[in-house]
Amino acid sequence: MIGKLKGTVDSFGEDHLILDVHGVGYLVHCSGRTLQALPRVGEAAVLFIETHVREDQIRLFGFVTEAEREWFRLLQGIQGIGTKTALAILSTLKPSDLAQAVALGDKTALARANGVGPRVATRIVTELKDKVPAFTAADPGLARLAADVEATEAAGGALADAVSALVNLGYGQAQAHTAIAAAGRKAGEDATTETLIRLGLKELAK
């Protein structure tokens, strides 16, 4: 199995490139985001490879980071998602944004990808939420966000209502969870929704 290729970009197609490795041209399928990140024709490139072997063909899928490849693998484990849809998702969301969308349960962000409807978006969140911590370890900001989301969702009640209120005011889910988690730490367990919203808005105004 091929795990990594290092060579020279020979040409680009709509959803792939030809990578010349010592005179052998490998056709590698990529997400739109990966194709945009690659250097120009004639320049050196390195791709992490996922190899799919079928009875009638061998297909290579390339990624600029191992995290992107791992998300590609995880996404295909979900009913209704094949290689085409997985690449469409990775074309729309970079790995850190995908992890954030799953952690926040942001189905709208996921549904922006071609081929992802409400049901598939829901399955992505439900089935991959437990996998997000593995991707947050190397990203302190994302790790804090995941912890804040877990704290507000586990507590429920006033915290959850306060998050919902901030989202309704137009703040993003990540902003709302982070602000209300900070407000909750300051106000304590018995804080009312109104108090949390007030403190949360102060956090957002900093």
Swiss-Prot record:
GO cellular component assignments: cytoplasm; Holliday junction helicase complex; Holliday junction resolvase complex
UniProt-listed InterPro entries: DNA_helicase_Holl-junc_RuvA_I (IPR013849), Hlx-hairpin-Hlx_DNA-bd_motif (IPR003583), NA-bd_OB-fold (IPR012340), RuvA (IPR000085), RuvA_2-like (IPR010994), RuvA_C (IPR011114), RuvA_C_sf (IPR036267)
UniProt-annotated location(s): Cytoplasm
UniProt region (Domain I), positions on chain: 1-64
UniProt cross-references to SMART domains, sorted A to Z: HhH1
Region Domain II, annotated ranges: 65-143
HAMAP family attached to this UniProt entry: DNA_HJ_migration_RuvA (MF_00031)
Family: Belongs to the RuvA family.
Name of protein: Holliday junction branch migration complex subunit RuvA
Organism: Azorhizobium caulinodans (strain ATCC 43989 / DSM 5975 / JCM 20966 / LMG 6465 / NBRC 14845 / NCIMB 13405 / ORS 571)
Gene name of this polypeptide: ruvA
